[in-house]
Regions:
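Short, polar/acidic, helix-capping and beta-turn segments at strand->helix junctions
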Residues: 2-128
């Protein structure tokens, strides 16, 4: 049985989907774009966008009672792979600051993302 996850600490879904689903032992987030849930704003800086997307993922994971250290897989969608080093630095800082091991990850370049942002991140977390 699955349960929809909803939190005001991450942006509301902008389409017919939920922020995440709780499957009991597994949490799957929808892709989180770097919209600040309090202001609705988006930074132009790709490092700041990476950080905000990860904070939004974390908010969905925490709404299910888990934490960043429970994330076991992420998929990162970027508009420009030339930003790879900048994304990696922000990504590394986020997991280090949250005392979380680095999860498995895929990173793919895409033509376009919702709201023309530069990055979107989705995650899978496990309840242990």
């Amino acid at each position: 049985m699955s349960r929809a996850i909803s939190t005001e600490n991450a942006p509301a879904a902008i389409g017919p989907y939920v922020q995440g689903v709780d499957l009991g032992s597994m949490i799957i987030t929808s892709g989180q774009i770097p919209v600040d849930p309090k202001t609705g704003g988006v930074s132009e800086d790709v490092a700041a966008q990476t950080r905000q997307s990860l904070e939004n993922v974390k908010a969905v994971v925490e709404a299910s009672g888990l934490k960043a250290s429970d994330i076991v897989k992420t998929t990162v969608f970027v508009k420009d792979l030339n930003d790879f080093a900048i994304v990696n630095a922000a990504y590394e800082a986020f997991f280090t600051e949250n005392d979380a091991p680095f999860p498995a990850r895929s990173c793919v370049e895409v033509a376009r993302l919702p709201k023309d942002v530069k990055i979107e991140i989705e995650a899978i977390a496990l309840r242990r």
